[in-house]
Amino acid sequence: MRLTGLRFFLSYESFGVSSPFDPACRLVTSPFFSPLTLGALRLLLAVYSLVTTITVLVFESVRYHDASGFLSYFTDLSYIGLVAYFWASSTQTIVFALRGQKSYPLQSWPRILQLLHVLLYSTITVFPIIVTVVFWAILASSSTFSTRYSAWSNVSQHAMNSIFVLFEILLTNAGPSPWSHIIPCFVPLACYLGVAYITHATQGFYTYSFLDPSTEHGLLAAYIIGIAVGYCVVFAIVRGICTLRCRVVSRYRRDSSEQVPSEAIDEWEHIDSEQPKESTGSEA
């Protein structure tokens, strides 16, 4: 039984990658928009986020000659995650619409790519919210809106990022993320702490002032623990909102054949209730 349990918790199914993958096509549908409209909206967000990323990188390179630390900021890294997700999801959704809403490419791709996609979804529904909260609660200052560029870039990367996330959480059939994602998605956040101190060692500056032990002293540990706890809280809240959205939409569906959200809950939450069955054979 122990071996059976270990196999289950290390399986793709335990991380929300069912076989067949996403039979309800929840990742490419919405309770409010047609697949083609959803694909177009996701493509719009993909284009905007990509243009924002390129503009910020080019502007900082040309105007401030300070692009060397671009990938050292969690804001930029999480925003790149948004770019990747919206380009991937918009492509899958548009192809799904063009195929007559029968299937989409990711369903036939290797399972490792399916796993990476659902993990990416889980990260982009949590990290941008953390970025927004930390920036406006701790980092924002009088210089935030000092110039047009500063105002636009800060609003785009520290406010609109969460609006994009809310679009996915509230207006699509995706999610809720399984609890098994909470640790894998926390790993990049934890590893970023190392990136921040490597940046200080190699380039001589702290990406975020609250990570400087010489000025924050004991508060540094409190900030780190607070962000870790905040991550868990945001993950749980987002998961709860997605579950509630699925149940509410399912309840008010007029056509029972369209109850995609209900199927989504069954598929994404099966690991919470499914227990490995005890072997009746010779399996140890």
Q: Language-model features: where?
A:
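Non-transmembrane, juxtamembrane loop and terminal tail segments
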Residues: 1-28, 103-106, 251-284
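Transmembrane-helix exit/juxtamembrane "anchor" motif
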Residues: 90-98, 233-255
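C-terminal TM-helix exit segments that contain a strictly Trp-centered aromatic cap at the helix terminus
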Residues: 88, 92, 130-139, 191-203
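Transmembrane alpha-helices of multi-pass eukaryotic membrane proteins
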Residues: 34-49, 68-89, 111-128, 147-161, ...
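Early transmembrane hairpin module of multi-pass membrane proteins
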Residues: 2-100, 105
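Membrane-lumen (extracellular) interface motif
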Residues: 53-77, 135-154, 169-183, 198-221
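Membrane-interface transmembrane-helix boundary segments in multi-pass integral membrane proteins
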Residues: 33-37, 203-239, 258-264
